[in-house]
Amino acid sequence: MRMTFLSYLKQWRGTAKEAFENVSIVAKFLCLLHVTDRYIISTTHVHGPSMLPTLNLTGDVILAEHLSHRFGKIGLGDVVLVRSPRDPKRMVTKRILGLEGDRLTFSADPLVGDASVSVLVPKGHVWIQGDNLYASTDSRHFGPVPYSLIEGKALLRVWPPEYFGSLR
């Protein structure tokens, strides 16, 4: 009987070791996925009227990279993912129209009239706007956005397939 118990113990130990190794591999893979998604490249579903006609109202899936803004490689015209200054839990997709030191003149409210406002983008900030001026809450409403709120740069649209390609 003692031999049987020891043989079961050895068998259990081998099975437990194999299970632990498999769980370890899965955990490492999940960590790699998280790091890739958070710090390198990810897909993001974006929707709403603010980026019409560049992005669809009903939604697009875009591929966004998360390295450029960390190395100061964001430029005028880039479409970026930004944490909303009004609600940091929310992400917004906008186009960069001004970098630090730029002076911009824009229509205060395009629905009301031609009154224009001029602003200087301060150091460490960018000016973002939606492509649809009539349906976008952007820097015209909350001012220049700190560079630290930029989460990524949109590379291309991957869904729907008929619109696959660059966002320029």
Curated annotation (Swiss-Prot):
Knocked-out gene: effects: No visible phenotype.
InterPro entries, sorted: LexA/Signal_pep-like_sf, Mito_IMP1_subunit, Pept_S26A_signal_pept_1, Pept_S26A_signal_pept_1_CS, Peptidase_S26
Main location, first listed in the record: mitochondrion
PROSITE patterns reported for this sequence: SPASE_I_3
Any single Pfam family the record assigns to this protein: Peptidase_S26
Keyword list, A-Z: Hydrolase, Membrane, Mitochondrion, Mitochondrion inner membrane, Transit peptide
GO BP term (any one): signal peptide processing
Molecular-function GO term, any one: serine-type endopeptidase activity
GO cellular component: mitochondrial inner membrane; mitochondrion
Enzyme class: hydrolase
UniProt key word Zinc-finger: no
Keyword Transferase carried by entry: no
Similarity remark: Belongs to the peptidase S26 family. IMP1 subfamily.
Function: Catalyzes the removal of transit peptides required for the targeting of proteins from the mitochondrial matrix, across the inner membrane, into the inter-membrane space.
Quaternary structure and partners: Heterodimer of 2 subunits, IMP1A/B and IMP12.
Descriptive protein name: Mitochondrial ATP-independent inner membrane protease subunit 1a
Organism, as annotated: Arabidopsis thaliana
Organism phylogeny: Eukaryota, Viridiplantae, Streptophyta, Embryophyta, Tracheophyta
Recorded name of the encoding gene: IMP1A
